[in-house]
Amino acid sequence: MLAAVIVVAFSLLPYISYSRDVTPITWDDRTRDSLAPIVQDKLDKSPARPSPVEYKTSLQTPINAPPDVFNHGKKKNKDTDSPKSSSPSPLRAGNSALLDASPRYIAAIMDPGDTFLPRLFCPAPTSERYDHLRPRAADGSVNLIQKPNYFFALNLHQCVGLLPRLIGSIVETMRFLGPQNCVLSIIEGRSDDGTYEVLKQLHSEMEQLRVKYYFDSSEIDPMVGNGERRIPLLAELRNLALRPLVESPRLYDPDTTVFFINDVSLCMEDILELLHQRVRQRADMTCAMDWIFEGTTFYDVWISRTMQGDQFFEIPQSGAWDFSKNLFWNDPKTRTRHEARLPFQVWSCWNGATSFTAKPLLKGKVRFRSNYSGEPTHFCKDLWNHGYGKIAVIPSVNVGYSDEESWAVKKLQLYTSENVLGESNGDLLAMIDWQTEQLGQIKCVPTY
């Protein structure tokens, strides 16, 4: 969970010897024979998928940008009656060479059929499954509500190659839900690979699309001083991305859904499934599952807790991830639902992509706050304390932190549409039996 400077929750535990910068994947050296029998069976029943485009980018070798100091953004006066500017603080000009290269990225973001830049292949969503998410007028046309009710928040750093897929999928989702019903808020920080320039140039496209777009940059670095203040700084960055929502609550529909998405490669169907399950399950929060090591290892074990109060897999005092393949080892019910790709309740999650109700934010009851256990963990704790404890993981939605990683993840864990194949909206087995009582104890892991 990188936030404007590093948006992925790096595990700082000294005993863990890996990093997320794993060896690049060679797509053509994986075969279906390497997959588990149950996954193989699903693959055999699924339509054939095209091979991914060879991964490359015209900005693969970043051009050195001048050492400009990013504008953190000055504290603004609270105003709940009038909208804030989509550029709340003066933005730097950006690197001219990177600005010249940005139109290719903008074109890819705005056009899902653009093939100039490679990206993760994404299937077209099944409209019948998600049609109920689109507000409709009496004549059947997409209805434009008076106030936005979908708020997309991101903290991004140094990820220009990911933007065609990540932002492109968000744009597709906003078009589906109705652009005027959506708000996009991005906090960027310290990028010199073209991320800043592309996101800045996105303003005119969002204006034409009639999406309210808030973009700002920050000089906050969660890893400054060896990451000693990483958690409070990450919390601050997340709150910056939510500022347009929490500072102007009257501008938003009371039933607004917030999508907070990390620097992951995901598809439109992934985002829509998180929303679909939030609506269908009447959940307060839904999360994907994020993976590393070619989709073999669940990543966000630091933040996520089961309804047993434990991590998704056991990490002993040595800090070793030796048991990472043994998910939900002490929770048979959750393990069964995960293996069946059915939604299951958890005490906390984040997992690369999440959707949650904006109600406690609009009421000023909840915000991200610092704690050594991780700011999303305490965000979920605050949701529970205010009566928003219907938190679920949607195991049909699986993501990775690059196009290559997500391709490997979706080969092993499957695409969302493959995981829900044959499932109907009336399938009672998929419904969660919610537990509303708080847990007595939650495992605390302060040593990450």
Please tell me what each predicted stretch does:
Residues 1-42:
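N-terminal signal-anchor transmembrane helix specifying type II single-pass membrane topology
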Residues 25-30, 334-448:
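C-terminal catalytic/acceptor-binding lobe
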Residues 135-138, 159-175:
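Short, well-formed alpha-helical segments that are part of the catalytic scaffolds
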Residues 151-159:
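A conserved hydrophobic helix/loop-capping motif in glycosyltransferases and polysaccharide synthases
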Residues 181-192, 218:
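Short beta-strand/loop segment that forms part of the nucleotide-sugar
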Residues 194-252:
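Active-site-proximal specificity loops/subdomain of glycosyltransferases
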Residues 251-266:
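Short beta-strand-to-loop acidic/aromatic patch adjacent to the donor-nucleotide binding site
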Residues 265-358, 362-367, 435, 439-443:
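Conserved catalytic core of nucleotide-sugar-dependent glycosyltransferases
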